[in-house]
């Protein structure tokens, strides 16, 4: 006679009774559910960190404002390039940081508007390269280092104010801008639209855009996959924990009604931020998608903020 445990294992291997068949079916369904969830979440995360849109080239030689291309280096990640629009000699420089899946060429009118006020303006590009891991973005961690490198390169020029810079950004760009402002005293004013506290928050918002944010297993699997990709940055604290460092630095927080999740986070960061600070609420965000009248109003608001906070 077989021992009871051997009989049980044999029944699971070759089920003949209804309950053993049910157990085997449940185990198989659970296994394939986990495998499917892992595959789907991995595919979604891959699509998020490898955005499809990129910066388009322009003919700098014939573009108004006489822009020039600049290059700056990142440790172990090669070089990047930016577009520098010269303003008044020894004037501050404003760096414009594009958002997620946004090309820098979409910000050219904003750059021109700020250049007309006498500022030096630089457009950075987050979309033109991939890291050694093959990803195009980690939703902010690496982008902070990119604009830090751009700012340090600009600070070596003799035709700009080497100690005063302004930053502007939206979503991805705003996270990078505010994060750099919290750690670099050369940043004297910062304007952020639809900013988030951690890259994981942006990941959840993007997962909702893919329609899997409320499904079982998929969000947690996706978050674990993203955390694995960005494990080297796990110790970086949220922006909210570093806001006290910005005491005395003028800040403009812009909330867009058409991005309600990001608007709530932006409002919370505004509330937690030390003075001086300003708050602006818009019906429509994302400068590139605005109508012409909305763009002009937006340009005037950004220019007004920097004129009062970062005098030439």
Positions of PLM-derived features:
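An N-terminal hydrophobic leader/cap segment in hydrolases
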Residues: 4-5, 9, 18-73, 80-83
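Serine-hydrolase catalytic core
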Residues: 72-74, 83, 229-311
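Short beta-strand element of the alpha/beta-hydrolase
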Residues: 91-99
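Conserved alpha/beta-hydrolase
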Residues: 111-133
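Alpha/beta-hydrolase active-site loop
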Residues: 137-158
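Alpha/beta-hydrolase fold nucleophile elbow
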Residues: 159-171
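Glycine-rich nucleophile elbow surrounding the catalytic serine of serine-hydrolase chemistry
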Residues: 169-179
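Hydrolase active-site cap/lid region
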Residues: 180-232, 244, 249-250, 264
């Amino acid at each position: 006679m077989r021992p009871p445990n051997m009989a049980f294992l044999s029944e699971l291997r070759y089920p003949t009774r209804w309950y053993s068949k049910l157990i085997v079916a449940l185990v198989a369904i659970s296994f394939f559910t986990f495998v499917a969830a892992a595959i789907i979440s991995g595919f979604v995360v891959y699509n998020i960190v490898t955005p499809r849109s990129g910066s388009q080239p322009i003919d700098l030689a014939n573009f108004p404002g006489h822009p020039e291309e600049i290059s700056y280096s990142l440790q172990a990640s090669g070089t990047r390039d930016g577009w520098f629009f010269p303003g008044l000699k020894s004037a501050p420089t404003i760096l414009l940081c594009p958002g997620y899946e946004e090309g820098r060429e979409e910000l050219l009118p904003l750059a021109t508007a700020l250049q007309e006020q006498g500022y030096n303006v630089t457009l950075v590009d987050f979309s033109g390269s991939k890291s050694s891991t093959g990803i195009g973005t980690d939703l902010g961690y690496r982008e902070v280092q990119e604009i830090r490198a751009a700012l340090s390169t600009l600070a070596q020029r003799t035709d700009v104010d080497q100690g005063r810079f302004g930053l502007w950004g939206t979503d991805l760009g705003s996270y990078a801008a505010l994060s750099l402002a919290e750690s670099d005293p050369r940043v004297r004013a910062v304007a952020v639209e639809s900013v988030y506290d951690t890259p994981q928050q942006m990941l959840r918002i993007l997962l909702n855009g893919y329609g899997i944010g409320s499904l079982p297993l998929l969000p947690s699997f996706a978050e674990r996959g993203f955390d694995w990709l960005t494990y080297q940055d796990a110790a970086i604290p949220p922006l909210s924990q570093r806001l006290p460092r910005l005491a005395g630095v003028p800040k403009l927080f812009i909330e867009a009604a058409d991005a309600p999740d990001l608007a709530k986070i932006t409002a919370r960061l505004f509330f937690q931020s030390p003075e001086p600070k300003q708050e602006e609420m818009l019906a429509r965000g994302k400068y590139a998608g605005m109508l012409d009248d909305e763009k002009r109003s937006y340009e005037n608001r950004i220019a007004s903020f920097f004129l009062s906070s970062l005098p030439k």
